Amino acid sequence: MRLVMASANAHKAQEIAEILSGHDIKPRPHDLGDIVENENTLEGNARLKAVAVCNETGFPAVADDTGLEVDALGGLPGVRSARFAGESATDDENLSKLLDEMRKVPEGERTARFRTVALVVFPDGREILAHGLVEGSITLSPSGGGGFGYDSIFAPDEGKGLTFAEMEPEAKNSISHRGRAFRSLAKMLGD
């Protein structure tokens, strides 16, 4: 099945394309402007992106939204993970702000989770929705050179002490929130 990617994030698009490799994945149209993610839920933001791309291309569109929920911060940054340090913040700025907010949180109280909502919207209005979750903790400092976003400070419980940024991509995808959501979505699509 042909699916058009709604994400403009190259790292995220690559992860998704690897997981949905049984489908004909097309990149997001370059002439499509920014899609403002102004919903209060991950599902709402994923839907905004998928609907916009589906309407623009006439093909089913696949989108996701992910939030990092840190218990010591009351669930923040959550739906605002990509904009935690401001609307045009970089990954490094978001990561620095999170570590700064947590500087006084002891190692045993740094529990967190990544939550992903993955969604396909079809031209006829149908939707397929899937969820992925991974529990872990926030490290005291960045570690590892792979991944993107908060990967260098998130150590999944199933990661044998490594951060996502220290893992090989296949190992990360096998336990990650995004991997779980998109594998579930792939099953619903008939893979």
Give residue ranges: language-model regions.
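Anionic-ligand binding patches
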Residues: M1-V4, H11-D191
